[in-house]
Amino acid sequence: MLGKKVVVTGVPGVGKTTVINGAMERLATEGVAYKAVNFGTFMFEVAKKENLASDRDEMRKLEKDVQKRLQQAAATGIAAMSGEANIIIDTHSTVKTPTGFLAGLPEWVLRELMPDIVVLVETDPDQILMRRLGDASRARDMEGYRAIAEHQEFNRAVSAAYAMYTGCTIKIVRNENFLLEQGIDDLVSVLR
C-alpha cells in the first residue's frame, strides 16, 4: 500500500516546522511513522552543489528558470523517497521573489508528488511578524501586517488550485501564540 503524502505549507515564520515536529513526536508514540522532508532544504542542497546559493534565503533571489530547475530536482528526489512510507513535505505554497510570487508547487512538481492532503499552517499576521523579528537565524525580508496577510490569502488561493489539479484535500491548521498544542492536535488528526 502506498504511503500518505502530506504537504504542509505556511508563510515564513508561521511555525509550520514546529507544528510538524510536534505532530511527528506525538504520532511516533502511537506507532504511526512519518518521514519529514523539507522541500527548500532539498533544493538548497542541489543549489549549494552547483555554487548557486550559500544559504536557503538566497534561493528566492535566483533567476526564475534556475528556481524551477531546482524545484524539479527536489520533486523528483522526494517522489522517489516516498513509495510506501508516509511522508510530510515541509514547503511553501508560494515563495515571494523580487519579481512576484512563485508557486512553490507548480504543475511539474505536483505531477511528481501527487499529495493526498495540503495543510496550510496559518496564524494572525501580527504574530508572524513578531516571530520573524525574533528569529535572528534567518535573513528574511521585512514585511508588514498587510503583506503577510496578502501572502497567506494568496497561499489559500494557490492551494485551492493545487487541490483542483491533484484531487487532494486542504486543511487549515492554526498555530496561534500559546496554543501550539492545539495546532499539533489538528495536524495529528489529519496525519492519522
Curated annotation (Swiss-Prot):
The keyword Electron transport does not apply. Its EC number is 2.7.4.3. ATP binds at G10, V11, P12, G13, V14, G15, K16, T17, T18. It is an enzyme of class 2 (transferase). Transmembrane segments: none annotated. Keywords: ATP-binding, Cytoplasm, Kinase, Nucleotide-binding, Transferase. One of its GO terms (cellular component) is cytoplasm. The keyword RNA-binding does not apply. InterPro entries: Adenylate_kinase_AdkA, P-loop_NTPase. GO terms for molecular function: adenylate kinase activity; ATP binding. It is found in: Cytoplasm. It catalyses: AMP + ATP = 2 ADP. It holds the Pfam family AAA_17. NCBIfam families: PRK04040.1. HAMAP family: Adenylate_kinase_AdkA. Belongs to the archaeal adenylate kinase family. This is Adenylate kinase.
